[in-house]
């Protein structure tokens, strides 16, 4: 089944501009409250100007261009402008430091970068040490440094024609993007994403949330992340909806922004839900137009119930990863939710639970979640320049090993247990970090929690809890360990606890466990 119909991203935007014209496509709000708005026709023109800018700078089909930007309209211009001329976007996590960013530039052989003044000093140093092929930088901002090889993005873009001047032959199988994984446990891998992948993501995710052209989809997820691109932007544009992109998340402002833009769909991660819940309750909490809140793991039942009751919303669980492109297992708008299930497998996919010998397991037994799709179409094509890593993750028949543990029930609903690499081995027992975090997060004094395994000479690993307390609270070790002993099996009780003011996170909200020991 080919629901994309051979359409690449260039054709998509030309069609969207023709069909929806003056309808609002994109609204962007900066941290300072400055709002920029684009219709489908005007956004397509901005994309064409950006494509022509890249062509003028020597970029051709197959060339790779890096973007290191916070959320902004220019990210959207560049993403689709590169796709229109067959070039490849390499988005860089906005929180990465110099060595990490240089590693991505080197491994993807990027010669041109688009970034902002905020990140420019880091790239000036990278260029000076000649460790990467980077030789030109397009800078977004008011001031342009007097350095060779630096251009002013906005000035150059404004001079370009709104009609595309370079139209190489494109196939849906062409690479549109190399998206490096977050690398919370190891070096990131470059996930190769095709035009087909992105077109499919638009249709699939629009189906998943029953998106219509009168919907308003608001997100604060970082644009360099798969969630923003494939479960928010692509479905919003594919359905002819209005896409609202916020520069950064603010717990104090978020719910007001939901009301301001009359958002009908949004997406949240656990950190957002927890920080929204500690905001003072207001009579306007339930005054909104939201019909669905896309939600990504993990949240305890108590937290879920408290959030949905206070704000009068439904959480639509969606499970996926960069390699699956979309949430391949999830709830559906018309279905009754079966919490804590992560839902059922979506169309165009198959899912199984397998044991360590790669054999399918019956209902109720815990094993690895494996997904079957079509590489380069419904799941990622490959890891860039890493054939061995690709072979480990992706079987020739299209089965993807997710590295996640879970099980399914007799009715085909799936349940997430934990990342397999996130299991702590303690004296012969496997302990799920997620299970412990969900239990401990129910403590009324605790705002945020993560547990990790640390080396133990006797029992393989000991369990350590890192805790962030609610403002003004104190928590003794005796009180903490007593709570754990009363709520979990003895072998699961942490051996150590440490109170912190915050936890290290990447831009998608994931806790960077390798920074905690």
UniProtKB/Swiss-Prot annotation:
Tagged with keyword Ligase: yes
MF GO annotations: carnitine-CoA ligase activity; crotonobetaine-CoA ligase activity; medium-chain fatty acid-CoA ligase activity
Reaction(s) the record says it catalyses: 4-(trimethylamino)butanoate + ATP + CoA = 4-(trimethylamino)butanoyl-CoA + AMP + diphosphate; crotonobetaine + ATP + CoA = crotonobetainyl-CoA + AMP + diphosphate; (R)-carnitine + ATP + CoA = (R)-carnitinyl-CoA + AMP + diphosphate
Keywords: Ligase
InterPro entries named in the record: AMP-bd_C, AMP-bd_C_sf, AMP-binding_CS, AMP-dep_synth/lig_dom, ANL_N_sf, CaiC
Domain of life: Bacteria
SUPFAM superfamilies, per the entry: Acetyl-CoA synthetase-like
Keyword Ligase (UniProt): yes
Pathway(s) per entry: Amine and polyamine metabolism; carnitine metabolism
EC number: 6.2.1.48
GO terms (BP aspect): carnitine metabolic process; fatty acid metabolic process
Entry similarity comment: Belongs to the ATP-dependent AMP-binding enzyme family.
Its job: Catalyzes the transfer of CoA to carnitine, generating the initial carnitinyl-CoA needed for the CaiB reaction cycle. Also has activity toward crotonobetaine and gamma-butyrobetaine.
NCBIfam families in the cross-refs: PRK08008.1
PANTHER family assigned to the protein according to its UniProt record, in alphabetical order: ACYL-COA SYNTHETASE (PTHR43201), MEDIUM-CHAIN ACYL-COA LIGASE ACSF2, MITOCHONDRIAL (PTHR43201:SF5)
HAMAP family: CaiC (MF_01524)
Name of protein: Crotonobetaine/carnitine--CoA ligase
The organism of origin for this protein: Salmonella schwarzengrund (strain CVM19633)
């Amino acid at each position: 089944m080919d629901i994309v119909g051979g359409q690449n991203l260039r054709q998509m935007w030309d069609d969207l501009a023709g069909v929806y014209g003056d309808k609002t496509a994109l609204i962007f709000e900066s941290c300072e409250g400055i709002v920029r708005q684009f219709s489908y026709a005007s956004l397509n023109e901005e994309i064409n100007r950006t494509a022509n800018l890249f062509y003028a700078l020597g970029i051709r089909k197959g060339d790779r261009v890096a973007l290191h930007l916070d959320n902004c309209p220019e990210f959207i211009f560049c993403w689709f402008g590169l796709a229109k001329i067959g070039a490849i976007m390499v988005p860089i996590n906005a929180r990465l430091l110099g060595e990490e960013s240089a590693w991505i530039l080197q491994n993807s052989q990027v010669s041109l970068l688009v970034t902002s003044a905020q990140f420019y000093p880091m790239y000036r140093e990278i260029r000076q040490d000649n460790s990467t092929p980077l030789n030109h930088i397009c800078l977004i901002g008011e001031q342009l440094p007097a350095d060779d090889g630096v251009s002013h993005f906005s000035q150059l873009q404004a001079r370009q024609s709104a009609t595309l001047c370079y139209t190489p032959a494109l196939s849906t199988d062409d690479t549109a993007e190399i998206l490096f994984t977050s690398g919370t446990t190891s070096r990131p891998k470059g996930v190769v994403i095709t035009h087909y992948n992105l077109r499919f993501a638009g249709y699939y995710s629009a189906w998943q949330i029953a998106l219509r052209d009168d919907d308003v989809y608001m997100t604060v997820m970082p644009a360099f992340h798969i969630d923003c691109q494939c479960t928010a932007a692509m479905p919003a544009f594919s359905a002819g909806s209005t896409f609202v992109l916020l520069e950064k998340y603010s717990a104090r402002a978020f719910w007001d922004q939901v009301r301001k833009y009359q958002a009908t769909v949004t997406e949240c991660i656990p950190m957002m839900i927890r920080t929204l819940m500690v905001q003072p309750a207001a009579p306007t909490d339930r005054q909104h137009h939201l019909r669905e809140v896309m939600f990504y793991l993990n949240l305890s039942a108590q937290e879920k119930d408290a959030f949905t009751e206070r704000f009068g919303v439904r959480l639509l669980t969606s499970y996926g990863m960069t390699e699956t492109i979309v949430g391949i297992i999830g709830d559906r708008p018309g279905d009754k939710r079966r919490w804590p299930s992560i839902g059922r497998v979506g169309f165009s996919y198959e899912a199984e639970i397998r044991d360590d010998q790669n054999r399918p397991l019956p209902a109720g037994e815990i094993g690895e979640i494996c997904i079957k799709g079509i590489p380069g179409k419904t799941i990622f094509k490959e890891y860039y320049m890493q054939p061995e890593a690709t072979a480990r993750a992706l079987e020739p028949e299209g089965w993807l090993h997710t590295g996640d543990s879970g099980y399914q029930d007799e009715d085909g609903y799936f349940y997430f247990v934990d990342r397999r690499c996130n299991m702590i081995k303690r004296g012969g027992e496997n302990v799920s970090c997620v299970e412990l975090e969900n239990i401990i997060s129910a403590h009324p004094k605790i705002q945020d929690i993560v547990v990790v395994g640390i080396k133990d000479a006797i029992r393989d690993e000991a369990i350590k809890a890192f805790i962030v307390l609610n403002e003004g609270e104190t928590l003794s070790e005796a009180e903490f360990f007593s709570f754990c002993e009363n709520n979990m099996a003895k072998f699961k009780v942490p051996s150590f606890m440490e109170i912190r003011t915050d936890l290290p996170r990447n831009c998608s909200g994931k806790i960077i466990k390798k920074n905690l020991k």
